[in-house]
């Protein structure tokens, strides 16, 4: 079913289910010794989508559930999440080393960095997402007996609404630099909402703030690859619709847009990240799915 501008979800439906899928990929990468996210598998189990639970537990074989030779699937996603998780973990470590003590995770989903990363003393982590998502994650992690490694402030608001006011009310200090993460987010926003998000991040950011974002091109080829993978997964028990979750239409290139706002962006193509981690590359043939995907880090310098 096509998205609407004010749709909502939990972690077993719509966009929320993609957060569970991503956590399943992190759990699989953790089982393979590629990353260390001990919270991913129990969070996926608690959501209760059987296909993702079996994925997280290592009970599914990629050779059985993936389309042979396809650009997307369980194994491809596990590889990508390995590279992505390492990249963003390193981003936060570098931001902390630079003295940044405010962290904002946009559309945090089942991200558990507030519990698994060694944050410097004085750091506060702000997590922004839909109320049902944040409530579920907090309750599940509390049942595990885990404590955050830095104070966590939940900001329960839709990013298409007035989240800047909610963030400030939660104690965010616009006079101090922040480290922002937009992981797996921008492609799920309407084009104009993507621009508003980056405008708001800029308005809230003091000089020296840093941002990391995943840029996922919503091309016809990438959509076809995602839909083909989803269809194969449904034949193996997936009962959640994962197609048509993005918003079609032309949109501004995030790195170029950020540069116009005073940020100094650096692009890292997806294949470079995969190569840096010794993982199989995606095709770069013209029109190939995901060939345009990249990761962007940026530092704000409003003074120019």
UniProtKB/Swiss-Prot annotation:
User: From which domain of life does this come?
Assistant: Bacteria
Print the keywords alphabetically.
Methyltransferase, S-adenosyl-L-methionine, Transferase
Question: In its keyword annotation, does this UniProt entry include rRNA processing?
Answer: no
Which BP terms from GO are recorded? methylation
UniProt xrefs under Pfam families: LCM
Quote the EC number: 2.1.1.-
Residues noted as binding S-adenosyl-L-methionine in the record, renumbered to the chain:
129, 158-159
Gene Ontology terms, MF aspect: methyltransferase activity
- Identify the InterPro entries for this entry: Ppm1/Ppm2/Tcmp, SAM-dependent_MTases_sf, SAM_mthyl_Trfase_ML2640-like
Family per UniProt? Belongs to the UPF0677 family.
Q: What exactly does this protein do?
A: Exhibits S-adenosyl-L-methionine-dependent methyltransferase activity.
Q: Which PANTHER family does the UniProt record give?
A: S-ADENOSYL-L-METHIONINE-DEPENDENT METHYLTRANSFERASE YKTD-RELATED, S-ADENOSYL-L-METHIONINE-DEPENDENT METHYLTRANSFERASES SUPERFAMILY PROTEIN
**By what name is this protein known?**
Putative S-adenosyl-L-methionine-dependent methyltransferase MAP_3385
- What organism does this protein naturally occur in? Mycolicibacterium paratuberculosis (strain ATCC BAA-968 / K-10) (Mycobacterium paratuberculosis)
